[in-house]
Amino acid sequence: MVSRKQKFWTVILVIVLAIVIIGGVFGISYMKGDVTFPWQLETGKAKTEEVAEPAKEELKVTVVEPESKEPVEEDIEEDATKEELVEEPVKETDAASTGVTLDYYGALHVEDGVLTDEEGNAVSLTGVSSHGLSWFPEYVTADSIKSLRDNWGINVIRLAMYTSDYNGYCVGGQDIKDTLKDNIDEAVQAATDNDMYVIIDWHILNDADPNEYKAEAIQFFGEMVRKYEDNENVIYEICNEPNGDTTWDDIKKYANEVVPVIRNVDDDAIILVGTPKWSSDLDSVLDDPLEFDNIMYTYHFYAGSHKSSARNTLTNALEEGLPVFISEYGFVAADGDGAVDTKEAAKWQEVIDEYQLSSCIWNLSNKAEGSALIASDCDLTADFKYEDLSEQGQYFFDMLKSIDSSDNEKEEELSDEVKEDVNQKESQLKEKTKQTKSNTEKRR
């Protein structure tokens, strides 16, 4: 028989065991996070899962890197496109060195003393003259000319073929003639391929009077015009720098026999005619100009030697309506050497810009003289770096870039049609950006 005392302790034992079992169950649940006690909420001890869950939601937003990066990439693309929009109108302006192209302007002609395109818009060619083809033929190759166009924005190349002097056309044998004509042909083709104009220059110098080799000139230009009559980009310069005792009457007599040879084949080609005193005397031409269409008269200057008086000669002729082409110039002295005269060079450039004159700087070579555009210790013939250029080469390159930049900034020079086109493209760009950001579409 069980006593009361035994019953009492049996009940106590059962209760203790129950407490232990229940406590163990709750303890395990608490550790797993399955149970939250009321007093825990008051002390801020939230359930582990409730703390972790918002963190998981936040992670989902920040982990999607393409979405967060896409607007940044779109901004970059937008900026790049805007740069293209700024550069594009430069091709619509006449003064921009990089804007004049054969494809855009086509065949040129002279109208009221100004070089113009087919629609009568003034055209300003900015170019480089070679040195003598017999001395430095490596600078008039396809690679060299393409480099000038792509890296410098040059749109005309002048091919200086000496008539006398070293391996001149008129003093060498047939092999010399053939080599020079091959040089010209490669350069003309390269200029055409690169959307440029090209000047074939009958480069008299020590022969002084163009009449000395007039028969050779007639034969040469007859051959050239028949070969290139379909090339709208070819310009003929029939006598570089008449000098010594040669007068305008002498030059006019020569021109009246050579120009018809070209005109018999090509009615419209631009023909450049040299003037007395190393192509610096325009006054005598004003009194008695040639009676042909599409004729321009050459004027040469070197900033280190020719200053205000020479500029007055040029501007007076221009004001009188004489069509002038600066087929050769330099920023150094007239002997082709010395340092750049920056003060006078800037004044000359102002005249060129004001009258929208076409010009070719002398000379593309690495000859050890101030007028060479390439440093004498540089053996490259294309893709020049800035440090590969001479003092004049660097000055010229900087000038080209400043002209290009200033024209880009002159929004007022753009036609209303061009402005409207630019604004329309910018609006389309902004709309595209909004759509890309909202839809996160893949850009083309």
Predicted regions and their residues:
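Short, low-complexity, Pro/Ser/Thr/Gly-rich segments in the mature regions of secreted, periplasmic
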Residues: 397-412, 416-421, 425-444
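Acidic/histidine-rich helix-loop elements
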Residues: 119, 123-144, 163-178, 334-337, ...
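Aromatic-lined substrate-binding rim segments of carbohydrate-active enzymes
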Residues: 141-205, 214-219, 263-265, 341-355
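N-terminal, intrinsically disordered, polar/charged segments of Gram-positive cell-envelope systems
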Residues: 35-101, 416, 420, 424-428, ...
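Extracellular glycoside hydrolase catalytic/binding regions
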Residues: 106-108, 132, 137, 197, ...
